[in-house]
Curated annotation (Swiss-Prot):
Stated name of the protein: Large ribosomal subunit protein eL21
Gene expressing this chain: rpl21e
Family to which the UniProt record says this protein belongs: Belongs to the eukaryotic ribosomal protein eL21 family.
MF terms in GO: structural constituent of ribosome
UniProt xrefs under HAMAP family: Ribosomal_eL21
Transmembrane segments: none
Pfam family, one: Ribosomal_L21e
SUPFAM superfamilies in UniProt: Translation proteins SH3-like domain (SSF50104)
Organism: Methanopyrus kandleri (strain AV19 / DSM 6324 / JCM 9639 / NBRC 100938)
Length: 102
């Protein structure tokens, strides 16, 4: 019998993988992006940046920025019927595209 692994990155073999052409250092753009309170953002984990990484279970979720904590943003999401607040670095966030109103 083997003990089950329970680490932070366990069972994320495909989720936290970069494609071969994306490997290496990440561009500086996502590190310097700014978000405003109330703005909707997608949580998309950059596996090459370990600081400020949310738990992989929240990869792909959409939330709302409610504040800042140092360099990080506090993002409110709904998980089941509960609201949760995640502390996430901007490298792991993408702004939600707003549909153009005509």
């Amino acid at each position: 019998m083997v003990r089950r692994s329970k680490g932070f990155r366990s069972r994320t073999r495909k989720k936290l993988r970069k494609k071969p052409r994306e490997r290496g250092l990440s561009p500086l753009g996502p590190m310097t992006q700014e978000f405003e309170e109330g703005q909707k953002v997608h949580i998309v984990i950059d596996p090459s940046v370990h600081k400020g990484m949310p738990h992989p279970r929240y990869h792909g979720r959409t939330g709302e920025v409610v504040g800042r904590q140092g360099r990080a943003y506090i993002v409110k999401i709904r998980d089941g019927g509960k609201e949760k607040k995640l502390i996430v670095y901007p490298e792991h966030l993408k702004p939600q595209e707003q549909p153009e109103l005509q």
